[in-house]
Amino acid sequence: MDPDTVKSTLSNLAFGNVLAAAARDYKKEVLANEKAQGSRPVNEEVDLDELMDDPELEKLHADRIAALRREVEKREAFKRQGHGEYREVSEGDFLGEVTRSEKVICHFYHKEFYRCKIMDKHLKTLAPRHVDTKFIKMDAENAPFFVTKLAIKTLPCVILFSKGIAMDRLVGFQDLGAKDDFSTTKLENLLVKKGMLSEKRKEEDEEDYEYQESIRRSVRSSANVDSDSD
């Protein structure tokens, strides 16, 4: 796909989903105003066709599109720094990885330790959900200098870095109920509490999912058009 096509696709991303979300917001505002004024609640569904020419809704739509574009640009910038996936790094790359990003979660592991594999599974799940935090891992056997420097005695050991400084750590599963069957949500909440992850609301997850799905559909559609034209 050529750059102009990509730019055009991005400019029209998620119109249907965003407009529907804007309509929901608009309806909530109407209901809130009705309630505040002591009027009868409005139960009718919002007609999107009637709202299309509403200047307030158009502004709301434009603001939402602009916010989503900024979010996409921010995500892309994070991904260029290695965010959005759970990656293995070498000892030689370690310092660069933890100093180039504001928040970094690094799992020091041993490939034969069962509990390290459990931690791997959870961190791999969290990495794409929290793009503003970098998730990496390093084989403790191949990183003797940093294992000693960071005084790592027990594995798994998850070191939490903020602006290149080791601020906290998770040693084994002692902060996770000392059980192997803890949930990803439990780990996520712990990392939120420690300031390493941003708390995500359910609405944000749903809108983000819809938006990303619309991106994929738009790209697939453009790709099919290109294929047909060939």
Curated annotation (Swiss-Prot):
It is found in: Cytoplasm; Nucleus. Residues 220-230 have a biased composition (Polar residues). GO terms for biological process: cortical microtubule organization; cytokinesis by cell plate formation. Expressed in roots, cotyledons, leaves, stems and flowers. Residues 199-230 are annotated as: Disordered. Residues 89-173 form the Thioredoxin domain. GO terms for cellular component: cytoplasm; microtubule; nucleus. Pfam families: Thioredoxin. SUPFAM superfamilies: Thioredoxin-like. Keywords: Cytoplasm, Microtubule, Nucleus. Disruption phenotype: No visible phenotype under normal growth conditions, but plants with reduced levels of both PLP3A and PLP3B show defects in cytokinesis, cortical microtubule array formation, oriented cell growth, and maintenance of proper ploidy. InterPro entries: Thioredoxin-like_sf, Thioredoxin_domain. GO terms for molecular function: beta-tubulin binding. It comes from the Eukaryota. Interacts with TUBB2, TUBB3, TUBB4 and TUBB5. Belongs to the phosducin family. Tubulin-binding protein involved in microtubule formation. This is Thioredoxin domain-containing protein PLP3B. It comes from Arabidopsis thaliana (Mouse-ear cress). The gene is PLP3B.
